[in-house]
Structure formats: C-alpha cells, structure tokens
Amino acid sequence: MARIAGVDLPREKRIEIALTYIFGIGLSRSKQILRDTGVDPNKRVKDLTDDEVAKIRDYIDKNFKVEGELRAEIARNIKRLIDIRCYRGLRHLRGLPVRGQRTRTNARTRKGPRKTVGVMRKKS
C-alpha cells in the first residue's frame, strides 16, 4: 500500500482517484500532479513502482500544503478572523453561516439540530 503525505492510498483504485483521498488534493490537482511527474493516471496504486511513488511524494511535498499542515493553516486563518473581531470571525464564533446565506429558515448545517422550544401550561 502506497503511503503519501501520511495517508494510505487504496491499492485497487486508479492513482488519479486514489490521490484525492489526501486532504487538499482534488481531482484536478491530482491530474496536474500526475501530468507533471509523468505517471500514467490510469495505473492502479498496486502497480506503481517505488520510484513513481517517491516522485509523486516529493512533488506533493515541494509544491502543496496538504493534510495536517493545510488543516492547521485553515484553523489559524479562522482564529485570526475571530481575534480581529471582524464580521466573518463573529459568524464563525457564533456557528452561523459565514458567506451571506439566509438564517431565518434553513442554515441547519451550521446551526445544528433544532432546539425544541416548549410551552408551560397552567395546571387545571
């Protein structure tokens, strides 16, 4: 099993698809990596030579932030927005949509499950 950027790539999948299992690499970036390293995108991960795996690994390490490094940068950026108390930072802080979506209805992904509001009744 090929291990690139701390991720075990699935052996049976094509390398083009398998690279997308790495956080920060989508299909278009995967195609770019394979084009620049000269590896056939239709090759299965199990059929890659050690040299090809090393070439891909080195290319990714030199050119992209992926996995933990990318997650840390995203977290730092969000923390910076919160620290400077800008509008986007406050939206992150309150767990509301950041990019201008409506909140009167919908926005359930950011707000979480509904909080049921109960009504107190008089005893009769």
From Swiss-Prot:
Source taxon at top rank: Bacteria
Pfam families, A to Z: Ribosomal_S13
Compositional bias segments (type: Basic residues): 101-124
PROSITE patterns: RIBOSOMAL_S13_1, RIBOSOMAL_S13_2
Residue ranges, annotated region (Disordered): 99-124
Any single biological process term in GO: translation
Keywords attached to this entry: Ribonucleoprotein, Ribosomal protein, RNA-binding, rRNA-binding, tRNA-binding
GO molecular function, one term: structural constituent of ribosome
Signal sequence, renumbered to the chain: none
GO cellular component, as recorded: cytosol; small ribosomal subunit
Subunit structure: Part of the 30S ribosomal subunit. Forms a loose heterodimer with protein S19. Forms two bridges to the 50S subunit in the 70S ribosome.
Function statement: Located at the top of the head of the 30S subunit, it contacts several helices of the 16S rRNA. In the 70S ribosome it contacts the 23S rRNA (bridge B1a) and protein L5 of the 50S subunit (bridge B1b), connecting the 2 subunits; these bridges are implicated in subunit movement. Contacts the tRNAs in the A and P-sites.
HAMAP family (UniProt xref): Ribosomal_uS13 (MF_01315)
PANTHER family named in the record: 30S RIBOSOMAL PROTEIN S13/40S RIBOSOMAL PROTEIN S18 (PTHR10871), SMALL RIBOSOMAL SUBUNIT PROTEIN US13M (PTHR10871:SF1)
Family as reported in the entry's similarity comment: Belongs to the universal ribosomal protein uS13 family.
Protein name: Small ribosomal subunit protein uS13
The species this protein was found in: Caldicellulosiruptor saccharolyticus (strain ATCC 43494 / DSM 8903 / Tp8T 6331)
